[in-house]
């Protein structure tokens, strides 16, 4: 199998273009759990016809699909972008035949074991993956009773939500200076998202990859906040938060926050305690000075100009 994978891998990466299956309801790669191996997979195709045949399999389940063309120079970025969402296998299809290749044969995850946790890029593959599975199912245009395993998917996502810490973008005011001091003195501005109906939300991000995808060239910095702190970070004029607005875009309103706090208090406490320990380690190590975080190991794929089918999803409008 290793030899077969070696030649198959070489065959895949030598192609000038691949078509990746994206889910229209999440603006992210379509994720699929293999019913036998239970590997979390993303599917790629040698041509458009192969993708269309695959998409047809899911049309009856009302799962919208679109093919995104990935140019050869963007392969590293694309496969690297699958690491933060917890994918373990890539399934390649050509001429009706499919084969699964472990993701780590395309791209290696950076070893951060010797880096203090507060300096590592924030990662949250469990939250990302369960969120994608949930939204693929929840946004199907079918009656709720026809949605497969919706309750269990929802519970698994909420547990991961309760355990998580998030990145919240801020704009630091007043020029140069210690960021922590500016935060304490209120010299920061929060980033808001204004909806077409007039509602205002604040973006939060599950990981550094999603934050950087949203940030692009803007001079945003990030506050790290556990789930337990979201309620206090939401003023009266804000309806809630949008998790990963450049990706699956999940609304987290006050009702959902209260539900999670009530149903999963132990998980919320674990997440808050873990965040406190990381922040305390940063204070003790830096002695009050703020050092630049390690950059995320991969960049978001840039499909503009490389897709003959559709463009990669953009960001939600931002004020």
Region roles according to the model:
Residues 1-319:
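An interfacial alpha-helical scaffold signature
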């Amino acid at each position: 199998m290793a030899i077969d994978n070696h030649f198959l891998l070489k065959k895949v990466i030598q192609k000038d273009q691949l078509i990746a299956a994206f889910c229209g309801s999440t603006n992210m790669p379509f994720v699929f759990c293999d019913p036998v191996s239970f590997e979390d997979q993303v599917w790629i195709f040698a041509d458009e016809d192969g993708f269309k045949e695959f998409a047809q399999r899911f049309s009856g389940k009302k799962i919208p699909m679109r093919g995104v063309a990935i140019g050869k120079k963007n392969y590293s970025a694309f496969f690297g972008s699958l690491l933060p969402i917890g994918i373990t296998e890539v399934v390649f299809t050509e001429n009706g035949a499919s084969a699964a290749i472990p993701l780590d044969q395309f791209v290696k995850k950076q070893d951060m074991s010797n880096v203090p946790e507060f300096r590592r890029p924030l990662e949250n593959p469990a939250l990302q993956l369960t969120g994608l599975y949930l939204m693929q199912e929840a946004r199907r245009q079918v009656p709720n009773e026809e949605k497969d395993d919706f309750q269990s998917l929802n519970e698994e996502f909420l547990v991961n939500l309760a355990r998580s810490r998030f990145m919240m973008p801020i704009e630091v005011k007043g020029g140069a200076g210690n960021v922590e001091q500016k935060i304490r003195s209120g010299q920061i501005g929060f980033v808001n998202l204004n909806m077409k109906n007039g509602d205002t939300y604040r973006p939060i991000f599950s990981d550094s990859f999603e934050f950087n995808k949203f940030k692009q060239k803007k001079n945003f910095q990030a506050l790290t906040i556990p789930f337990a702190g979201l309620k206090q970070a939401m003023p009266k004029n804000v309806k809630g938060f949008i998790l990963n607005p450049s990706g699956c875009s999940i609304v987290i309103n006050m009702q959902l926050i209260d539900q999670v706090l009530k149903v999963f208090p132990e998980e919320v406490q674990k997440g808050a305690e873990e965040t406190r320990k990381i922040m305390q380690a940063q204070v003790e190590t830096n002695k009050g000075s703020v050092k630049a975080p390690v950059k995320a190991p991969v960049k978001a794929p840039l499909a503009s100009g490389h897709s003959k089918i559709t463009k990669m999803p953009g960001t939600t409008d931002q004020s």
